[in-house]
Amino acid sequence: MSGTFLGFDFGTKSIGVAVGQRITATARPLPALKAQDGKPDWNVIEKLLKEWQPEAVIVGLPLNMDGTEQPLTARARNFANKIHGRFGVAILLHDERLSTVEARAGLFEHGGYRALNKGSVDSASAVVILESYFEQSF
């Protein structure tokens, strides 16, 4: 087992990406992927999987604050299932409530408004999702 994990913050226009290590329980952002109505370029995802060879992929599960599902929840779950179906990699879904809020706060703290572009926020959210998964699981 490599101890490497990829994290995805699913969105219909942009999908945040992060890579992390279980041993350090830390993650770092990778460039966000463009998506057309939630559909990524699967060749790019394949390249990420080949490059990082993750033990598992963590996909953020968007839930309402009360824990109920929202319309995007099913689409994120479908995205996760497609990754598993196409590439056979282990998939874990992880609650992503407040990940975008935390990501925006961290980016703003380090770079002000200029740091708050869509791709940066999405990949920073993927970092938050992955590190939250590590904290709860290991």
UniProtKB/Swiss-Prot annotation:
Annotated EC: 3.1.-.-
Keywords noted in UniProt: Cytoplasm, Hydrolase, Nuclease, Ribosome biogenesis
PANTHER family in the cross-refs: POLYNUCLEOTIDYL TRANSFERASE, RIBONUCLEASE H-LIKE SUPERFAMILY PROTEIN
Record family assignment: Belongs to the YqgF nuclease family.
SMART domains assigned to the protein according to its UniProt record, in alphabetical order: YqgFc (SM00732)
GO molecular function, one term: nuclease activity
Chain's role: Could be a nuclease involved in processing of the 5'-end of pre-16S rRNA.
GO cellular component: a single term: cytosol
Record flagged with keyword Hydrolase: yes
NCBIfam families with a match to the protein in the record: RNAse_H_YqgF (TIGR00250)
Pfam short name (any one): RuvX
HAMAP family: Nuclease_YqgF
Protein localization: Cytoplasm
Protein name (record): Putative pre-16S rRNA nuclease
CDD domains: YqgF
Gene Ontology biological process: rRNA 5'-end processing
